Structure formats: C-alpha cells, structure tokens
UniProtKB/Swiss-Prot annotation:
Catalyzes the attachment of glycine to tRNA(Gly). Its EC number is 6.1.1.14. This is Glycine--tRNA ligase. The lineage of its organism: Bacteria, Pseudomonadati, Thermomicrobiota, Thermomicrobia, Thermomicrobiales. GO terms for molecular function: ATP binding; glycine-tRNA ligase activity; protein dimerization activity.
C-alpha cells in the first residue's frame, strides 16, 4: 500500500486519536454537540499555540519589513459593503423539499456527477441537478428547490433592539481590519513600501461544511499578511511570497511530496483577486487547499477610500509620487494546518515490547518546533526515591521547555503514550540516576537512548532542538 492510498483510509483514525489524546473534542459534547463546532483540548491548545508562534516568528519577527496588528472582530457594516462581502461573499445552496436538508450545489454536482462547476451560473447548476435527476443524499427523494445565493456572513446586532438598520457582522476574514488601519500604521510605524502587516485572529463563516473533521469550520483562526507594494512590482513579490510560504511549510515539518501548488482558473478567482495560487495538501480525503496566496491589486484600499471618503494613498518619497499601493496576501488557516500536521505526522510501524510481544507502534512525528510537549520526564518506577529526583528534574526543565511529567503505568506504556502525542524526547530517571546523577534521553523517532548528566541536561535538549 503506497503512502497516498494509506492516507485515504485513516481520517477516522486521526479523529479517534485527536479525541482520545486530548487534541480536539466535539463542541458542546455534554449537550449532544453542535454541528461543525469543535473545542481544542490540552494538547490541541499547545499545538495551536506552537503553530501560531512559529508563523509569527517566521513571517513577522524575523523580517524588518513586517509589523503586527490585532484588529477587532466587529467592524463598521460599511466595511463589508466596501470590501464586496455583502454582495459577493456567497455560496450556491440547494434544498431538498422533502426532508429540508440543505447542500452546497457546487459540491453536490462535483461529487455526484464528477464534473467541475467552474463558471456555471445558478440557473445552469439548477438545470444540471434536474437533468441528472439527482437524489437527495439524505432521503433519496428527487425534489429540489432552485439553486440560490446564500451569504456566508454571520449577522448580529448592537444595542438592545434588533432592527435591520443596526446589523453588524462577525468578520469572515481578518484582512479588512488591516486595510482600514493602513493609514494609521503608515502614520505611526515609519514603514516604507514595500512592507507588510500581519495578524492572527478569529473569523466566522456560515458555511455548509462537508464533515471532514476540522477541515472547514464555522469559527476558525486565520494567519494573514497584507503586503503593500508598488503596482509594477507585483509579479516579483508574488513569486517571493510563494517561495516564503513553501519554505515555512517545510520549516514546520511538512513532507514535500504531500504538497503541491495550483493556480486558480479565471472563474474561480475571488472578486478581489487578479491571481491566486493555493498550496494543496494530500489529505485523507484527497488533494485540498491548505493555504493560499492572492494578488488583491489595489481593490481593497481603493474601495475603502471610495466608501469612507478618506485618502488612503501612499506618498512614495523615493519616487516623489502618490499612489494607492497594491497588495499581495499570503493567508493560512490555523485549524487546517493543524489537521494537515496531524495527518502528516501520523505514522505506524511494527514493534516488539520488552516481553517480546509484537505490537503496532503509533507515532506522531511532529517537528519539535510545533510538538505540544518538547520533553516528558518519567521516573522508571513510582518509588519515592525516584519520584523525588524526577520532580526536581521536571521543575528545572519547566524553566526552559514545555514539558509533561508522568509517573502512571509501566515505563513502556508511558513511552508509547508520548510517542502517540508526538513528544520528541523522554527523560527517564532510574536507579543509576541515584548513583551517578545521570538520566537517559530517549529519542522518539529512533527510540535510541543515551545517558546524560543532569547538570548538562538542559544544554543537551537545547542542542537537539536547535539541530532538528
């Protein structure tokens, strides 16, 4: 069985591991759950934090041409009119008249008829469903409403009275907070084109999701950059950011053979984009978008200048020229990267326990940069003399690394648990430790163990993490 075929059969395994080990829980589970919502448990919270920290370090902290922003979730309603989301941010939906189930028409057609819906109008999709005599996947009846547009933004209201004159929206993307603050950043940060503004934050989309775990969510986190450039330089910087995104994905541990790029066709492009390229990952359910790069031209700043009446041009001192900058946008979703990392890191291999019994060893081979815990500290046995030293070692390591201390069950079971949650190194305190103040460091991927003095343990782990 090749790697790609193996990947197609194990989404259930990934979901089971994520729940069992505390990466992801169904949302509101004690109340029966809420469709398409998920909570991230102790390990999931650590993995998300490491992923966001890695993104911030790579794209913001390491570059002199980047600054950060933390924009609000609620923005003035006119922002979304100017951005085009009120008119353009729609999915084509179709309903079964019998059971009232609702589906994305494009997904239904592509999955059932195996043909692209790129460029099709709503009427053309309606006609395709009728001519193919498609049955409802839920009840089997062939009685459909016409395909219609459905706006994906969540609406809410400010104030005690809900009226149509006071709606606001939960932001469907983080980008607009950057555009409406462009003038503020230029005036307060001494930035010069080319420069970028990056932020990490929640976004919300009222989508009909396909049920592929956390691949597509109603509530999710985006890591976005708006990079402002001279109009004539867009191709150079588009290529630059495409390369940077690929380098980042490899930097956090993705296998290159499970990544590819795909450029959007003309009919696929978002209303603001002149060119978009996706990085796709080979998920258990096939090649799907992992993250994307878009050339947004001057669409957003020009529209906000028009709708707000504010001057959003930039004065380029080097050229003695005023213009509206163009924008290159690298964007990544935290949860989608999270799922891809779980899939990419998951591995099974035959092994033999200390008693000679064969078993299947499950390992999450996370890069140490994103692994939830860097080190586990394990006393060989739950004996007071070993536990005392182990807790002292754990307390020392906590000052430098995110660690886990565990003294429950046999040492073999504890090793297997740490393998399954992706911990790169296990430090074991045994009876030799009491004699010579040395401990063993076990490598997750090779299972090799070496003895190291406690006095040099921090330096040894730091060296291993740096060289990973």
């Amino acid at each position: 069985m090749d790697a790609r075929h193996a990947a197609t059969v194990r989404l259930e395994t990934i979901v089971s591991l994520a729940k069992r080990r505390g990466f992801v829980y169904p949302g509101s589970e004690i109340y029966g759950g809420l469709a398409n919502t998920w909570d991230f448990g102790p390990l999931g919270a650590e993995l998300k934090r490491n992923l966001k920290n890695a993104w911030w370090e790579y794209f913001i902290q390491r570059r002199e041409d980047m600054v950060g922003l933390d924009g609000g979730i609620l923005l003035h309603p006119r922002v979304w009119e100017a951005s085009g989301h009120v008119e353009e941010f729609n999915d084509p939906l179709i309903d079964c008249r019998r059971c009232k189930s609702r589906f994305r028409a494009d997904t239904l057609i592509e999955e059932r008829l195996h043909r692209s819906t790129e460029g099709l109008s709503l009427d053309e999709m309606t006609r395709l469903v009728q001519e193919a005599n498609l049955a409802c996947p839920v009840c089997g009846v062939r009685d459909w409403t016409p395909v219609r547009k459905f706006n994906l933004m969540f609406r809410t209201f400010i104030g005690p009275v809900e009226t149509e004159s006071t709606p606001v929206y939960l932001r469907p993307e983080t980008a607009q907070a950057i555009f409406v603050n462009f003038k503020n950043v230029v005036q307060t940060s001494r930035v010069k084109i080319p420069f970028g503004i990056g932020q990490i934050g929640k976004a919300f989309r009222n989508e009909i999701t396909p049920g592929n775990f956390i691949f597509r969510l109603l509530e999710f986190e985006q890591m976005e950059i708006e990079y402002f450039i001279r109009p004539e330089m867009w191709e150079e910087y588009f290529d630059h950011w495409l390369n940077e995104m690929g380098q980042f994905l490899r930097w956090i541990g993705f296998k290159p053979d499970r990544l590819r790029t795909r450029e959007h066709g003309p009919q696929e492009l978002s209303h603001y984009s002149r060119k978009t390229v996706d990085f796709e990952y080979f998920f258990p359910f096939g090649w799907k978008e992992l993250c994307g790069l878009a050339y947004r031209t001057d669409y957003d700043l020009r529209r906000h200048q028009e709708y707000s009446g504010e001057d959003l041009t930039y004065f380029d001192q080097e050229r003695n020229e005023r213009y509206i900058p163009h924008v290159i946008e690298p964007t990544m979703g935290v949860e989608r990267l999270f799922l891809a990392l779980l899939c990419d890191a998951y591995d099974e291999e035959p092994a033999v326990d200390v008693n000679g019994n064969p078993y299947t060893r499950v390992v999450l081979r996370f890069h140490p940069r994103v692994a939830p815990y860097k080190v586990a500290v394990l006393p060989l046995l739950r004996k007071p003399e070993l536990v005392t030293v182990a807790r002292e070692v754990a307390q020392e390591l906590r000052q430098y690394f995110r660690i886990e201390y565990d003294e429950t069950q046999s040492i073999g079971r504890r090793y297997r648990r740490q393998d399954e949650i992706g911990t790169p190194y296990c430090v074991t305190i045994d009876y030799q430790t009491l004699e010579d103040r040395t401990v063993t460091i076990r490598d997750r991927d090779t299972m090799q163990q070496v003895r190291v003095p406690i006095s040099g343990l921090v330096e040894e782990i730091e060296a291993r993490l740096r060289s990973a």
